[in-house]
Amino acid sequence: KGYPIPERKGEDYQKFIRSMKALGYIFDCRELVAADYGAPTTRKRWYAVFRRDGKEIRWPEPTHSRENTGLQRWKECGDYIDWSDLGTSIFGRKKSLAEATQKRIANGIKKYIIDAPEPYIVKNKDALAFIIQYHGETRDGESRGQLLTEPIKTIDTSNRYGLVTAFITKYY
């Protein structure tokens, strides 16, 4: 009735690979992280390569890295946000945000701005920013989200993410 059979997991995949090899193809596969190749996302993807031209399969070398390893640093997702449109402020709303949402935002400000060693500073906006997920916390009760100084994590199509900007001002 369309349900997976755990004890037969991978059979169709192996059949497919055997069929391709029977046609004369060589095969290799691996999981690659997009950020290692210059994309501003940490999404992992499985890649398969089949060849039958007599040449060996060659994989690209990473061009970027999270650490300082001589490669370029991972791209920051904050560099790809249109900062000319910060959306609608939460402060002029007719209906207040739910208490849980307010708590998530406060926790996120603490985690990604106040306690962050290098928070993301929005250029020319006098603001600090981060992305928040507002459909739950971690097991430790911490806010889900991320700094904008990193490549973006996977964002699904649910309406459960927000860009939080905390404006900074000088007090004399």
Question: For the regions a protein language model found, what residue spans apply to each?
Answer:
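Class I S-adenosyl-L-methionine
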Residues: 1-159, 165-172
